[in-house]
Amino acid sequence: MSDFQREQRKNEHVEIAMAQSDAMHSDFDKMRFVHHSIPSINVNDIDLTSQTPDLTMTYPVYINAMTGGSEWTKNINEKLAVVARETGLAMAVGSTHAALRNPRMAETFTIARKMNPEGMIFSNVGADVPVEKALEAVELLEAQALQIHVNSPQELVMPEGNREFVTWLDNIASIVSRVSVPVIIKEVGFGMSKELMHDLQQIGVKYVDVSGKGGTNFVDIENERRANKDMDYLSSWGQSTVESLLETTAYQSEISVFASGGLRTPLDAIKSLALGAKATGMSRPFLNQVENNGIAHTVAYVESFIEHMKSIMTMLDAKNIDDLTQKQIVFSPEILSWIEQRNLNIHRG
């Protein structure tokens, strides 16, 4: 594939993603908090700091990976980096493969660091890149963490995608052992299982982003790029973010779990934190905001999102993220069936 074709593919991904709409129904709607009428705290008591062994985020919300590798996406990364700088959010760039292959593309990613020199930035590579390239990806952005995206359904629907996956787990193990910053194993919208969590724990992984279905749909994106558009029947493949977080429960004491995929509102973010996530990521909502409404409106959107999270936590009488994990939740029969059939051990306060 030529560099021009790769740039074109990057642009197609963003164009199709922006055209997708939020799911009408979400598993976040299948879980409810129990309301208690009189809080014992004030809004000003809320501490939204997200603390993991290696990363401290001012807020448990981050701009998740989407873009880079073309001139248009350079402009998007530039604007998102300004939003991150002005709001204190962490930010992940899209796959840096284009820059690792072609130095001419490096600026489409490094613009994020240029515009946000003191901020928290995650670099991003695929599970098949050599260790040396993973190290380069971290150095390229002076990144505080490295996402490794695992996207086998996307690759298999992508006309020119990868068809070989046997080496992925061993390669991830090599990268984790060599890279000095936290390595986050990131799904791309298909969710994670307890079996995968076991395998990742065995090779020393300490961070995952479960990225469940319900948000940006890469099966749909790649199917749109197929000549016959003949794999639309896989549109609903995978676990939701709620199901994925439940799948991780037994591993949350040893692996820091981030949640993304289909988060629509501050309440969805709070529900993710209550299920054990340490932070929540969104990509398309920020992408649409910054492209359609500009930087200032996107900053205001983020500030409002954070304030709404504080209001919800006050209603729940939760001073911090750890308190949220003790709050009572009522699940729908469908989610309870998932828990039972998957033999998940869910204990709450």
From Swiss-Prot:
It is an enzyme of class 5 (isomerase). Its cofactor is FMN; NADPH; Mg(2+). This is Isopentenyl-diphosphate delta-isomerase. The gene is fni. The lineage of its organism: Bacteria, Bacillati, Bacillota, Bacilli, Bacillales. InterPro entries: Aldolase_TIM (IPR013785), FMN-dep_DH (IPR000262), IPdP_isomerase (IPR011179). Its EC number is 5.3.3.2. Its main location: cytoplasm. It catalyses: isopentenyl diphosphate = dimethylallyl diphosphate.
